[in-house]
């Protein structure tokens, strides 16, 4: 849920042991949730690839997250098509 137009949220978050100041249109709770997911994903991938440096780990995390996003987007499109064919939309 977006905040009022033009109103930005600023929050400090910790991702993989580093502090970041994040500014966005979403609520602070949304930004915290996004940061927590990124942190969790980085830690999950680090457990599987402990020799990766932080930069490579960050890129691998981005690749994995975008992969998940694309898969969900494709599933969403298939569901929309299915609903349209059944006259549910």
Swiss-Prot record:
Name of the encoding gene: zapA
SUPFAM superfamilies in the cross-refs: Cell division protein ZapA-like (SSF102829)
Entry function: Activator of cell division through the inhibition of FtsZ GTPase activity, therefore promoting FtsZ assembly into bundles of protofilaments necessary for the formation of the division Z ring. It is recruited early at mid-cell but it is not essential for cell division.
InterPro entries: Bac_CellDiv_Activator, Cell_div_ZapA-like, Cell_div_ZapA-like_sf, Cell_div_ZapA_firmicutes
Gene Ontology CC entries for this record: cell division site; cell septum; cytosol; plasma membrane
Protein family membership: Belongs to the ZapA family. Type 2 subfamily.
Stated name of the protein: Cell division protein ZapA
Source taxon at top rank: Bacteria
Main location: cytoplasm
UniProt cross-references to Gene3D superfamilies, sorted A to Z: 6.10.250.790
Cited HAMAP family: ZapA_type2
Keyword Cell cycle: yes
Subcellular location field: Cytoplasm
One BP term from GO: septin ring assembly
Swiss-Prot/TrEMBL keywords: Cell cycle, Cell division, Cytoplasm, Septation
Lineage: Bacteria, Bacillati, Bacillota, Bacilli, Bacillales
Subunit structure: Homodimer. Interacts with FtsZ.
